[in-house]
A protein has these predicted regions:
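Conserved ABC ATPase signature
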Residues: 128-132, 136
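Helix-to-loop junction immediately C-terminal to a conserved catalytic motif
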Residues: 39
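Conserved ABC transporter NBD signature motif
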Residues: 47-55
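Conserved catalytic motifs of ABC-family nucleotide-binding domains
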Residues: 149
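ABC ATPase NBD coupling module
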Residues: 1-5, 56-72, 98, 218-223
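Conserved ABC ATPase "signature" region
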Residues: 106-123, 232-233
Length: 252
């Protein structure tokens, strides 16, 4: 299916199953607001958000509950997204209980599976967020989002709070998970080099409006707006292969 989105101000696009769509723009461009509207966390004065036939903006509480199992978000700052009072077992199993998935007695085994999937050792099970590195915390946030087996992940600047070598590790993980699980991503970032390497389609926002969209390489090769051209001119020369090569050199 497709998710048609109209939000912020004349913003309209669709996400196809198994596709990675990059959403780029400067701070204040409306990227995160768009994400929150898609998730049903923020209301919109008009337009629509449709997911597999469901009109999200007019959905009942019960419908939204089911929708939020299928659409999960990974935030920019994992420190703010994780409860510091809980250990990883409680943090990652919380969505299982919220959506009534499986039995509580099976939570430990499921959480251990999720930790392994995101590249974390099982002996972290009873650690709290403060006892983890920034990269480990973001992996926990990803594991938590994956717990309910979503179809769409909205990734809001998932790398920007991390150091460059750790960004490379998490980016590599996200690409692998997308391939292995057939996930659909809306990947929000201000880093064009990263978005270019991970996304099939590219959306460019400025001042709450969509100013460019299309296949990623087409937008890079033939930008349709002056704003996009300016973003490309200002783009650092670091491509995703270079980022990943840096991680390998560092032995990460």
């Amino acid at each position: 299916g497709q998710t048609a989105v109209q939000a912020v101000d004349h913003v309209s696009f669709s996400l196809r199953k198994g596709e990675v769509v990059g959403l780029v723009g400067e701070s204040g461009s409306g990227k995160s607001t768009t994400a929150r509207i898609i998730l049903g966390l923020e209301s919109a004065s008009g337009g629509s958000v449709r997911f597999d036939g469901l009109e999200v903006l007019g959905a009942s509480r019960r419908e939204l509950h089911g929708y939020r199992r299928r659409v999960q978000m990974v935030y920019q700052n994992p420190w703010a997204a994780l409860d510091p009072r809980q250990d990883l077992l409680a943090i990652i199993s919380e969505p299982l209980r919220a959506f009534g998935i499986g039995q509580r007695r099976d939570d430990r085994a499921r959480v251990l599976e999720l930790l392994e999937r995101v590249g974390l050792p099982g002996d972290l099970l009873h650690r709290r967020p403060a006892q983890l590195s920034g990269g480990q915390r973001q992996r926990v946030a990803i594991a938590r989002a994956l717990a309910v087996q979503p179809e769409l992940l909205v990734l809001d600047e998932p790398l920007s709070a991390l150091d460059a070598p750790v960004q490379a590790q998490v980016l590599d993980l996200l690409q692998r998970l997308q391939r292995e699980l057939g996930l659909t991503y809306l990947f929000i970032s201000h880093d064009l080099a990263t978005v270019r390497g991970i996304s099939d389609q590219l959306l460019v926002m400025s001042q709450g409006r969509l100013v460019d969209q299309g296949a990623t390489e087409e937008v890079f090769g033939r930008p349709g707006s002056e704003y996009t051209r300016r973003l490309l001119e200002d783009m650092p020369g670091r491509s995703v292969p270079e980022i990943l090569a840096q991680a390998q050199v560092a032995g990460l």
